[in-house]
């Protein structure tokens, strides 16, 4: 899990043109709190997303399916924003939580992309993006081959 730090929240609000207030953080940011779920198979990711959408105590806000529609650099993951009930002294309120679901290989790729993106030897951004996309495509092919071994899928 992850909870964004106060200075990071304030910086993001200012960057997007908002005053750094608690109310703006609640209303404008949907990634203050987050969790990442790592699965073996894409089929399990899809089943878990469907389960989360049907969960009666959560509010489905939106999703970004980067597995079906990868980013140009090859990033693949399924992000779901859910409203989670938070009980306060005088009221119950729903706060957005970002849930990232991906496979082990997608998580490995994302970690390597983060590491490579900060290396000075890759000044040629186009070359770096092309290489990352190539590696993402290789991992995707491997995942599809391994899917046949999914004899214990997450069931709804």
Language model: regions and residue ranges:
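Surface-exposed, low-hydrophobicity interaction/linker segments
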Residues: 1-18
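Long beta-strand-rich cores associated with HINT superfamily self-processing modules
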Residues: 26, 39-148
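Terminal, regulation- and interaction-focused segments at domain boundaries
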Residues: 32-39
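Eukaryotic low-complexity, non-globular regulatory regions
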Residues: 147-156
